[in-house]
Structures are given as C-alpha cells and as structure tokens.
Amino acid sequence: MIRSRRFFLALPVMLAADEAAAQLAAWYPLEGTDKSFFVELPGQPIYKIIDTTSPAGTPFAYHSYSLEYRRLSFVAQTALYPADVDVRQPKLNLQSALDDRAQRLAGGKWTQVDWKQVQGAPAVESIGPLGGGNGLRQLIVLKGHRYVSLGYMAPADAMRAPEAERFFRSLRLLS
C-alpha cells in the first residue's frame, strides 16, 4: 500500500516532467533556405518569398517564415541586399528599418530600443505597442549585405514570455 501511495504522489511530478519535455521536443529547428541563419520556433512555419526592390530599383527577395502559435505570432525574415544598398554605416540601415516599422506601432514610437551585437554583427532589438493591447518585439541584424529579422507579436504583457526568450536566444547567423 505504501508503494502505491508513493507512485500516485510521484505521478503528477512525472506527468509534469513529461509535458515539459514534450513542449521542448515540439520546437521546430529552422535553417533558412539560403543557409543564412538558424532559429527555433514552437512549430513548423509557413514559408513565403516576398519580392521587393532596393531604393535604386534592383529587385531582391525576402525569405519569410511565419507561425501563429496560440496567442503568439513569430516571424523570421532574411534577405541579401543588392550591391546598390549602401551598408557601410549599418546603424543607419538599422535605424531606417526601425523608423519604417514604427509607423505601424500605436503612437508611432518604440518604447524600448537596445543597440547590440549579434555574433559580431550590428543589431537592434526593440519593443513597441500595437493596437488592442498587443505588442511587437523585434531583432534586426545586418551582417554585411545580409539582413536577418525576428519579429514576435503577442499580448503586451507577454513580450518576455518563455516562448519569446527561446525564439530570440536561438538565433544563429550561419553565413
């Protein structure tokens, strides 16, 4: 009888550990189709190619991976900027990306901006409010002509949720 009680007392702990392990195992390792980056997402994303042009009119493409997971949205994008995009002052390029995306924020401003390095490449991480009590967190990295961006949209109080932290910390530049 004592042995049965111990088993039933240990059962919730064993089930919780199994559930945590299953959640970890469910994360999807994503290597960009162009082999430029690696990131983990909590499921398999939808892949799209977004055609665009540089300010000088040279065509190029963004490779975009997006996932809706519960109340959370994850986006990873990369592009190889054409030669006519001047990347000699990467902070200006990163600031331009910040300014462009700030137009979509409630109030048109980021509430938090953190300039940093990711694997030696200039980067900026930012957080800002969206409508309806949601927020946007993004990380943009520019390594030479290689642009990599991670975006995370969720309720404003979930900007530092475990899923977000794992997503952002998993980024690795591969080329």
Give names to the regions the model predicted:
Residues 5-9:
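N-terminal export leaders
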Residues 34-36, 69-71, 131-133, 145:
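Glycine-centered tight beta-turn/hairpin loop motif at sheet-sheet or coil-to-beta transitions
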Residues 40-65, 97-143:
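Signature of long, low-cysteine stretches enriched in small and polar/charged residues
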Residues 33, 42-47, 90-105, 145-175:
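Surface-exposed amphipathic alpha-helical segments
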